[in-house]
Design a protein with these regions (language model features):
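Conserved phosphate-donor/acceptor-positioning beta-strand/loop module used by diverse small-molecule
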Residues: 193-210
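Hydrophobic anchor at the beta1->P-loop junction of P-loop NTPases
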Residues: 108
Length: 210
């Protein structure tokens, strides 16, 4: 009798669990539909801005959204978790805008100190674009610094790594590629940059670079 009662209680608990899971699934459906609708609205906003010459960047709107969320989440549970979700939503909205604006890669060239990292960080903040730091990637893959690569394998090897990485980047779109100072010295590298990107030359005063 106890076995039967124990089994009945276990079945009841399992039924409750299934009901909760079903409710969770319904929440996921609502969230998914809302996200898809939101993304479509973001695209419509971009179309409107282009048609009416409205500035693409409107940081005050993002500030208003943050203020709204803070007001809505006052005294509520899981405040940090909800904030993380909305941060991700905002970041993905920026990505949608970036894809609309830049259906190509942005390739930054210039001497060290010309501002490539500064511009890259700005584009990452404003449009949530992925950043490809060529020197950093080559160093990470080699497991050594750029200077050690030169010393161990020679400049020719390093330049070949640059060329191969640029070729690899042809499979990517809507990313910022920050090139090493000597990358454009190879004509074939420039050709690769232009295949799927817009090349931006950054300049600076000699005293800034040196």
């Amino acid at each position: 009798m106890r076995t039967s009662t124990h089994k009945s209680g276990k079945d009841k608990n399992m039924n409750q669990l299934e009901v909760l899971r079903e409710s969770l699934g319904q929440c996921d459906e609502i969230i998914l539909d809302a996200l898809l609708m939101r993304n479509r609205i973001v695209e419509d906003i971009m179309v409107y801005k282009e048609a009416n010459n409205v500035p693409i960047l409107q940081p005050e709107q993002e500030a208003k959204q943050k203020e709204w969320l803070e007001r809505r989440m006052q005294e509520k549970r899981h405040k940090n978790e909800v904030a993380d979700v909305f941060e991700s939503i905002t970041r993905n909205s920026k990505k949608i805008q970036a894809r609309k604006l830049f259906n190509y890669n942005i390739v930054l060239i210039g001497f060290m100190g010309a501002g490539k990292s500064t511009i890259s960080d700005y584009l990452k903040t404003v449009f949530a674009m992925d950043i490809i730091e060529m020197d950093q990637i080559i160093a990470e893959r080699a497991g050594m610094s750029i200077s050690d690569i030169f010393e161990t394998y020679g400049e020719q090897y390093f330049r070949d790594c640059e060329t191969n990485l640029l070729i690899e980047m042809q499979s990517r779109t809507n990313v910022v590629i920050s090139c090493g100072g000597g990358t454009p010295m190879r004509e074939c590298n420039v050709a690769e940059m232009k295949k799927n990107g817009r090349v931006v030359l950054l300049t600076a005063k000699p005293e800034t670079i040196l």
